[in-house]
């Protein structure tokens, strides 16, 4: 038994790498068991081992060499599609089709596949009429047919190029000539007709199928708008889940790739990734809807307003039962916003059991240990039939069990709607940390394998969404779409009217970084805008959750905006003033890991508000040019992560101190980088390459009142403070005094200043 176990353990051995022109392969040796006839006569007759009775066969082992491509030219990667089909390596085909947009266009891949490898009537083939040539042509034909079938089935959106659909037309012409009447030809023809029909509907003013609408339902009837209190909590949660699931199922997974998402704010790409933008818009609409319903009626009494908050907490709990983590997070974030949290009298009227329920729901999105709770929950319940809830509150536990039992009795299975920012942040971090090319200019396909791990999770959860069996409620959707949403300034002003600001002598919690964020960076990718000046009244941290630096801050104010300035609210007004600061210090060292589902190329170092209004489009910095570093494919160094130094690399975030707010850009720092080189790379990413680099200095933010100036001759990797967040500022030299004067003229009593101040107003400045 021990020998058998050892044989199984050694059945696969790592053999190293093979390098050939245009490609690098990873080689493994695998022992494969084969059955042969026990006597020579049967073997001479060609009798297969599986055709003989037991006892007449003998087991033998054969060693097979398996090559997995790690990097290569585009030609080699496309050629490997054919060999992968022959080796039954369908995983490679899925990885390539899901990620090739990061290094090639649909036209380039299609031309290589069809013109170079798919020309079965070339002169060479015609001259050689041997049987082996015919068999080879048949093998290639079957391989190409299988690849095209998978392409049309898995990535149909690649061919959506209205109005003429050139790639789809080229593919259809090829299939008509080379494979008439085949299944791929029928699929291509049906897809072309579908695209053309949708284009006609769009031209006629009908809603596009890639955005959420009630296109399959009758028009909403007019009439008086219903009141929010008229809708039951389970109905609201079900309708929100219906809308979220419809949008999530339409998300094109490869649009989430960091290399694609980072191009969205270019002028020519304003229509890029519409399915993701629609999901973001729905998230933000719900967040603002929660705030509007709570603040909307000035005539409401404190008890009535508390009832509305209680209702939203119950709706969030129903969303949890439905495994709708997108709406759950939106509601929690809205209730944590500054304009809602500051209503102390209102929160005091919320029943204690609902406050405890709210804390438990908020803890799901705790950033402790790189958002471990939400990750484990998603992995555990992603494809399960029902939610699995455990509550420390007895009343909540009983209510949950009753609801779950009712679902089981009715035979209703639930899908899962994830928080999309989880995947976007992961893919953005992967794109930032891993190189596109290795030595020799070969495409780093190992990076694409890592990205596919995230893409595969998106596709799996999209399939799980088909388990939902819900129909739209016209009355609720009409109410939801007609809600008048408030801007951040409007909501805060209204909040102050409802409950006046506390006196200066009143003890209030210190500013903190919330553990729950909203989709405010989905339009920012690796860029994050932060609010440098905390308001007077800020929410406190949860009684049990941790706060601090979060890499899961992905959100957007509106579908049309590219940037979002922010601050964030909190969870419970139960803490004492000293508790939030203690929790903040305990959790400030938390960081994100690159292999996880919730990383981002940049985290948040200041407060984020789910209800922020976008700044002027004229002030939006252009997207940075993506730099390509050349590294060896044989490197075994772990990918760098934010807020953590590996052996000789790490990721830092750099913002420019100006009047447009603080937008962070992520930069990979090595142990060899000097200050001038880091400044030049930061200027390139912030589109400041036209300015002289000598005019700027690099400053690390130590705390709210301390900063560290990196000397021009220093090695940044060793000069920086590795015990605090890796947040830096690119500042013009000799501008400190002028900026402090500007800040001193800004009112300190208003909750929001007319012009954003800079981070330069700190009490202590450390110079090496």
UniProtKB/Swiss-Prot annotation:
Q: Which UniProt keywords apply?
A: Guanine-nucleotide releasing factor, Phosphoprotein
Q: Where is the N-terminal Ras-GEF domain?
A: 65-196
Q: Which GO terms describe its biological process?
A: Ras protein signal transduction; small GTPase-mediated signal transduction
Has keyword Phosphoprotein?
A: yes
InterPro entries in the record: RA_dom, Ras-like_GEF, Ras-like_Gua-exchang_fac_N, Ras_G-nucl-exch_fac_CS, Ras_GEF_dom_sf, RASGEF_cat_dom, RASGEF_cat_dom_sf, RGL1_RA
- The Phosphoserine modification is found at 520
Bias-annotated ranges (Low complexity): 541-561, 586-596, 605-621
GO molecular function ontology, one term from the record: guanyl-nucleotide exchange factor activity
- Cellular component annotations (GO), alphabetically ordered: cytosol; plasma membrane
Q: Where is the Ras-GEF domain?
A: 232-501
State if Phosphoprotein is listed as a keyword. Answer: yes
Q: In which tissues is it expressed?
A: Expressed in a wide variety of tissues with strong expression being seen in the heart, brain, kidney, spleen and testis.
User: What does this protein's UniProt record list under function?
Assistant: Probable guanine nucleotide exchange factor.
**Could you tell me which PANTHER family the record lists for this protein?**
GUANINE NUCLEOTIDE EXCHANGE FACTOR, RAL GUANINE NUCLEOTIDE DISSOCIATION STIMULATOR-LIKE 1
Q: What is this protein called?
A: Ral guanine nucleotide dissociation stimulator-like 1
Q: What organism does this protein naturally occur in?
A: Homo sapiens (Human)
Q: What is the lineage of its organism?
A: Eukaryota, Metazoa, Chordata, Craniata, Vertebrata
């Amino acid at each position: 038994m021990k020998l058998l176990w050892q044989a199984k353990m050694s059945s696969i051995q790592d053999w190293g790498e093979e390098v050939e022109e245009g490609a690098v392969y990873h080689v493994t040796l695998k022992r494969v068991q084969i059955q042969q006839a026990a006597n020579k006569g049967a073997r001479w007759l060609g009798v297969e081992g599986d055709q003989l009775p037991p006892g007449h066969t003998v087991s033998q082992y054969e060693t097979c060499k398996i090559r997995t491509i790690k990097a290569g030219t585009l030609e080699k990667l496309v050629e490997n599609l054919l060999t992968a089909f022959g080796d039954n390596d369908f995983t490679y085909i899925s990885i390539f089709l899901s990620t090739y947009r990061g290094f090639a266009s649909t036209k380039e891949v299609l031309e290589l596949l069809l013109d170079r490898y798919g020309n079965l009537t070339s002169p060479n083939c015609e001259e050689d009429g041997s049987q082996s040539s015919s068999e080879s042509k048949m093998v290639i034909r079957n391989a190409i047919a299988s690849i095209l079938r998978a392409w049309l089935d898995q990535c149909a959106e690649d061919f959506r190029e209205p109005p003429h659909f050139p790639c789809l037309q080229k593919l259809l012409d090829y299939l008509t000539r080379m494979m008439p009447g085949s299944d791929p030809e029928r699929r291509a023809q049906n897809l072309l007709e579908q695209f053309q029909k949708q284009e006609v509907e769009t031209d006629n003013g009908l809603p596009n199928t890639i955005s959420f609408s009630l296109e399959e339902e009758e028009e909403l009837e007019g009439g008086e708008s219903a009141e929010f209190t008229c809708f039951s909590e389970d109905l609201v949660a079900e309708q929100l889940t219906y809308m979220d699931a419809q949008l999530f199922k339409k998300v094109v997974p490869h649009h989430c790739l960091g290399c694609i998402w980072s191009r969205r704010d270019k002028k020519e790409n304003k229509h890029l990734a519409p399915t993701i933008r629609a999901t973001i818009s729905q998230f933000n609409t719900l967040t603002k809807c929660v705030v509007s319903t709570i603040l909307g009626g000035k005539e409401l009494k404190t008890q009535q307003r508390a009832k509305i908050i209680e209702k939203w907490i119950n709706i969030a709990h129903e969303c949890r039962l439905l495994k709708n983590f997108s709406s759950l997070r939106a509601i929690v974030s809205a209730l944590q916003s500054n304009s809602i949290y500051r209503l102390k009298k209102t929160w005091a009227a919320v029943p204690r059991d609902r406050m405890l329920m709210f804390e438990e729901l908020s803890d799901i999105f705790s950033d402790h240990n790189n958002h471990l709770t939400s990750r484990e929950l998603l992995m555990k319940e992603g494809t399960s039939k029902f939610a699995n809830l455990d509550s420390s509150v007895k009343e909540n536990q009983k209510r949950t069990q009753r609801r779950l039992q009712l679902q089981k009795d009715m035979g209703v299975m639930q899908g899962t709607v994830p928080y999309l920012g989880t995947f976007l942040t992961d893919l953005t971090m992967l794109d930032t940390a891993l190189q596109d090319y290795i030595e020799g200019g070969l495409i780093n396909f190992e990076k694409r394998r890592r990205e596919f791990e995230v893409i595969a999770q998106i596709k799996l959860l999209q399939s799980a969404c088909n388990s939902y069996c819900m129909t739209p409620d016209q009355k609720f959707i009409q109410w939801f779409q007609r809600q008048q949403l408030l801007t951040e300034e409007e909501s805060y002003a209204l909040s102050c009217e409802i409950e006046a600001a506390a006196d200066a002598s009143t003890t209030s919690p210190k500013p903190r970084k919330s553990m729950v964020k909203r989709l405010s960076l989905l339009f920012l990718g690796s860029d994050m805008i932060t609010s440098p000046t905390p308001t007077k009244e800020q929410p406190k941290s949860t009684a049990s959750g941790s706060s601090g630096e979060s890499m899961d801050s992905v959100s957007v104010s509106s579908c049309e905006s590219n940037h979002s300035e922010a601050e964030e609210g909190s969870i419970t007004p139960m803490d004492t003033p000293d508790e939030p600061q203690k929790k903040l210090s305990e959790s400030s060292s938390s960081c994100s890991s690159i292999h996880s589902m919730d990383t981002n190329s940049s985290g948040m170092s200041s407060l984020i508000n789910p209800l922020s209004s976008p700044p002027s489009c004229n002030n939006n910095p252009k997207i940075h040019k993506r730099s390509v570093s050349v590294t060896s494919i044989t490197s075994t160094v772990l990918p760098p992560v934010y807020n953590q130094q590996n052996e000789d690399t790490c990721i830092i975030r750099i913002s420019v101190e100006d009047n447009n707010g603080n937008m962070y850009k992520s930069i990979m720092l090595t142990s060899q980088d000097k200050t001038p080189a880091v400044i030049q790379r930061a200027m390139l990413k912030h589109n400041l390459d036209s300015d002289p680099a000598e005019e700027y200095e690099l400053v690390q933010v130590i705390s709210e009142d301390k900063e560290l100036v990196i000397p021009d001759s220093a090695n940044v990797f060793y000069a920086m403070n590795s015990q605090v967040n890796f947040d830096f500022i690119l500042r013009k030299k000799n501008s400190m005094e002028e900026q402090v004067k500007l800040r001193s003229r800004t009112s300190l009593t208003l909750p929001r200043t007319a012009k954003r101040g800079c981070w330069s107003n700190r009490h202590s400045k450390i110079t090496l």
